[in-house]
Amino acid sequence: MLKGRLVRYLHHGIEFLGVLVEDGAQGGRYGLGANLIAPLDTTNDMMEFIINFERLGGIKPSAPQVSLDEVKLLAPIKSPLQDPICLGLNYLDHAKESMRFKGEKDSKLENPVYFSKRVGFFSDPNSVFSKGRFTNQLDYEVELVVIIGRDCRFVSHSEAMDYVFGYSIGNDLSARDIQLKHKQWYAGKSLEGSFPLGPCIVLRDSLDAHNLTIKSFVNGELRQHSSTANLIFDIPTVISELSGYFTLRAGTVISMGTPSGVGMGFVPPRFLEVGDVVSCEIEGIGILDTRIES
């Protein structure tokens, strides 16, 4: 069984990996419901930890524990080995609002839509995203992120979940005007720093990833509210299909798509402005905040 919640954090200027101490706390920073972190004594590199999980002997917390209030949480993975794999239009309600925005006819997808997002680094919880001068239509997308734990190739649907390491929250920040300009998603979804990730990685057997409430807020106003039960294509389907096309390496990040309620879905659209704070929340994982600056 893979259980627990892992974090990457900065304490007195030094990076550590740790496991959250399940002490029954409610709420708290980052919505984690925990006050203490037990450092891991193996490595401070989460990608190395994932890839070599069995060789490193799994989770081995050490003493002394530190308070969550004394540290700065970092993105649980500093940077991906390869660009993350993303799913587009994987909630029916979001597929409909996206097609309305583009003036296309509503329809349900028969097959998953896959794309990649250029990511040199994952942005930390409570980080600032600078939207720059290239977009006036910056949008938010709360997403369940799946992290692969072992290399997999030609994996069946029934075996697929055995290859999952854990889950996190991603915000797929997207420049809609750049997407429309280039008539595809890659550039508009790849602005520097446009993939905040965190606040932790919840190990696979700690929750039911297909029955989680998923929400986003802008300045405290609820914008997105759905459940991962509404995914059109579930996690085993995605892993099984992709592993047939190519090897999914340990540490691969897969972002499962977003529900309706994004800025472009409103009439008129409600895109992000300088000073806005986006809060992405998934039940059992936590809260991921990002502030928008110029």
Model regions and ranges:
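Catalytic-pocket segment enriched in acidic/His residues
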Residues: 66, 72, 94, 174-294
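N-terminal non-catalytic cap/leader segment that marks the start of a structured domain
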Residues: 1-108, 277-279
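Short catalytic-site patches enriched in acidic/histidine residues
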Residues: 113-131, 153, 193-200, 259-264
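A short secondary-structure junction signal
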Residues: 96-99, 125-128, 155-160, 178-182, ...
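A generic local secondary-structure boundary/capping motif
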Residues: 74-76, 102-105, 129-138, 152-159, ...
